[in-house]
Amino acid sequence: MLDPYENLANAIVLQAVKDYRDALKRLKKKPSNQAAMSDAMECERFFRSGWYKALTSVDGEYLIQKLREEAKSL
């Protein structure tokens, strides 16, 4: 069973994934959307941060790549 801190860490990472997916979808619809670009860049900074590395063992660059591939296929 996961402890509450692991649950919180997982929830933080999952929310960032949802936010990144949303930003990529908005960029696909309208590439000039500055708010979506800003949101995507903020998520990428998080995925490359030390805080992200403290929350999960999933490689941030790998996650970014997979989410971009997913967005292209939609």
Roles of regions detected by a PLM:
Residues 1-34:
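N-terminal acidic leader/helix
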Residues 34-72:
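Short, charge-rich amphipathic interface segments used for partner binding and complex assembly
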